[in-house]
Amino acid sequence: MELMNLASKETSYWMIALPAGFGSQNLHDVSTLGYLFLAVVFLSIVTWALAGGGGVAWKNGRNRLGRVAIPGPRGIPVFGSLFTLSRGLAHRTLAAMAWSRANTEIMAFSLGSTPVIVASEPNIAREILMSPHFADRPVKQSAKSLMFSRAIGFAPNGTYWRMLRRIASTHLFAPRRILAHEAGRQLDCAEMVKAVSVEQNGAGSVVLRKHLQLAALNNIMGSVFGRRYDPLAQKEDLDELTSMVREGFELLGAFNWSDYLPWLGYFYDSIRLNQRCSDLVPRIRTLVKKIIDEHRVSNSEKKRDIGDFVDVLLSLDGDEKLQEDDMIAVLWEMIFRGTDTTALLTEWTMAELVLNPNVQTKLRDEILTAVGDGADGDVADADLAKLPYLNAVVKETLRLHPPGPLLSWARLSTSDVQLSNGMVIPKGTTAMVNMWAITHDQTVWSDPLKFDPERFTGNADMDIRGGDLRLAPFGAGRRVCPGKNMGLATVTRWVAELVRRFEWGQDQTEPVDLGEVLKLSCEMEHPLRAVVTEIF
């Protein structure tokens, strides 16, 4: 009885306190509020129950437009599968869900009010990525706030986006442009090798990540802005730039509940996204505008064929001429995207070589045979074609550790899309491809958990630039990564030099851990620490 009285008092308190919090002291309003709450709960449960496969965002039969229904988990009312995917490693969770339900072709689920499908099978993945009806991307709140909706990655499919793509493909990522900046990549690599040697001699081991990140930053800054940073002489400027890039990574890679439950953004912002974006954007504008202004003054006579990418953008005229805000957005995206994948892919590759010394030895023998020792100079871009085992090692790393396991950024259907399996994906659906699931599927790859570069040697070699969806880490179709060739050239050169110059072994006080953390890309959770022995 005492417990019942206590419960009654608690109930009475909340019946008065809740409406009072909304500005009411009328008990009639209390019952009205209660009825409204119960009605919302009831309708949410009914909607969820009737939605069927895929959950609440697939209500009204959205998953049954074709002759074959799209299967998938219901999740829970209102939230769908948000709680399942908002923590941990989403690519592994989705793969486990698809494999356990035999839904590898395609699986529907709900992220709040957002209908989502994920493909975990190469043929359906190809249909999605190659379809012109999936050429758009859903724009996250952070991407819009950080100006990415006016850059190549997130700009909607149309005249403006095609123009940006053409400019980048012609003036930054074309083979002749990549070759023109070879000397800069060679310089970045030489500085990294020197820094690795200094750290090993001073500390007895090397944490590779910071050296890779600096080299990646200087690589993209050199080709895009025509400048590089000395970590000692320009420490303040370098710290500011790396701080901005790191903050951008965190904001764009963070799971923002308001992207899927828009009403939540009015009163809940757990990561302070709006405030942090508002603080970061002026810093970006100041940095990039300063560089643009410097180019306007000092490079007014420089031709686009011999200048950097800023010179190219400033030289454009007519329909191709960009407004300054658009130019800032495009250049900021180049910095942002260019400093991520190359560094983390190289770190994953070196970690696997530390764990597989036989592979490391075979790779070093190939490099020394084709290129020679230190007396013959550094590895050149022209040498990379003579190193098939090196290319196989990088491809196998991309298979085991795709930097964008869900291809980083999803696609958005602009109309109903009929697939070959009889399913129809409705207009307005967010589409993902789980590349990690495909590259770890034993029906696609033999012994998929084993690091085995031999699977890419000889006649078993394959195109990884979007032609074969068994391994397409850079995507495919209209939204394939435009910088894939530059990125691969950079990573293979770095790995070649690091293996040629040093022997890499485990630090027994901190063994290599291949645990993952999924941010904007999939990184090593614990940075690689190794003991290196200088060869020459």
UniProtKB/Swiss-Prot annotation:
TM helices/strands, residue ranges: 36-56
Domain of life: Eukaryota
Gene3D superfamilies (alphabetical): Cytochrome P450 (1.10.630.10)
Compartment annotation: Membrane
Entry's EC annotation: 1.14.-.-
GO molecular function: heme binding; iron ion binding; monooxygenase activity; oxidoreductase activity, acting on paired donors, with incorporation or reduction of molecular oxygen
Cross-referenced InterPro entries: Cyt_P450, Cyt_P450_CS, Cyt_P450_E_grp-I, Cyt_P450_sf, Cytochrome_P450_78A
GO cellular component: membrane
Keyword set, alphabetical order: Developmental protein, Growth regulation, Heme, Iron, Membrane, Metal-binding, Monooxygenase, Oxidoreductase, Transmembrane, Transmembrane helix
Record note on disruption phenotype: No visible phenotype under normal growth conditions.
Keyword Heme: yes
Membrane topology of the entry: Single-pass membrane protein
Similarity field: Belongs to the cytochrome P450 family.
Name this polypeptide is given: Cytochrome P450 78A7
